[in-house]
Amino acid sequence: MGGMRHGRVTLHLWLAATAIGAAVLAAGLFMTERAEERPLLAQVRKAFLPGATTSGHHQIELACETCHTTAFADADSMQAACTRCHGDELKAADDKHPLTKFTDPRNAELLTSIDATRCVACHVEHRPEITVLMAVTQPDDYCVLCHRDIGTERPSHAGLAFATCANAGCHNFHDNRALYEDFLLRHAAAPAQLPRQLRPLARFAETAAMLPTYPSDRYPLVPLDRTQHDAPAETPTVEAIAGWLGTAHARAGVNCGACHRDSTTSAWIAAPAAEACATCHALESASFGQGKHGMRGSAGLGPMTPAQARLPMRRAAADTALDCTTCHGAHDFSVRRAAVDACLGCHADRHSLAYEDSPHAELWRRELASDAPEGSGVSCATCHMPRTEHRYREYDFKTWFVQHNQNDTLRPSEKMIRPVCQSCHGLSFALDALADTELVDRNFAGAPSVHVPSIDMAVARERGTGTE
């Protein structure tokens, strides 16, 4: 009898433990509260991660609901989560493998090899053992599934291994804006150095003057002096006022209250949140939330810190929370500091550490010293946060804004060619330089030591000579 009672007690304890475990698992997977505000929830989610996340998603791995929008989300829900974040980028890239290609009945048989209508067919999360560059979870030679006859159709490709399709300067699955044949031919003869080497300049005040929505009644676009600041008498410091006076804000009539006063109650806010910046800098703010620096905020998590990065970072900056003022400062809003010094204050990878001794850095120093024209220097931001054209269709004019989504020109590296490299360099030189990994690590100090034959192949095919 005693053995039976002991068995029943053991069973009850096991059932209770199972119920508690199930409750903890359910809470960890399906609660939508911010995990960072609930340490126990964060620990539960970490414990139940089915595998390491990719470098693109690791920052938001505790915000499970970002991708898993419902409990046991079906394929359509997961696909919707992918396109919610990445859909606009694919449209802008003129995606070469869009959904319409595979819903065309003529291509139906291709789906028997790989279901390219679903992002997760090629990008499976939590599977580090099969994940390669750009979070791809297909074998390197997956192009053969649909393009097995390419060696016959293009003699120049005969004998090339299918694992080389995605080599630098050749092909990308989605974004080929700098790689398609007509583009290669159009820029085939461009020299390594272009005659006009100036980056476009962002003129926010000029843009604001053209926007009917800008509150010009409260902040007329006229310069302000020290006596015209509108901060409470007991609030401003000499340093804060001095910093503000030297900014584009003061020169454009943007007073202290534009950032520090609550728009509803007019109460003074000592430390405005990033939302205050977004009031005027909406494009920059939105793109910041799409990149590595700001994506955690978009997922409802706390700010990114360098300690959370997977790239080498400076130890002294490990716990620095990233927001607008981290790089720009709280009153002087220095775009020059944000363009280089702020970057090198955190990043400690080979490419970043080599910047100061690079030709690009020398051009930047010459511009800062007024020994070269404005727009001729090359800072970290010149390449990784380039000026991007934006058209206000409702007002029928266009302007330039600073793209704060670093990923927009980062991977694959050919995405950088049109908005960045071709501001100064010819296409062939740019393709070769980006394909030279050692040169990239040296921050482009020197000439490329590799050659990408894409342009050569396109020219030979156009002329009807060579292997084409």
Tell me the role of every PLM-derived stretch.
Residues 39, 44-213, 222-467:
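Inter-heme linker and motif-flanking segments adjacent to c-type heme-binding CXXCH motifs
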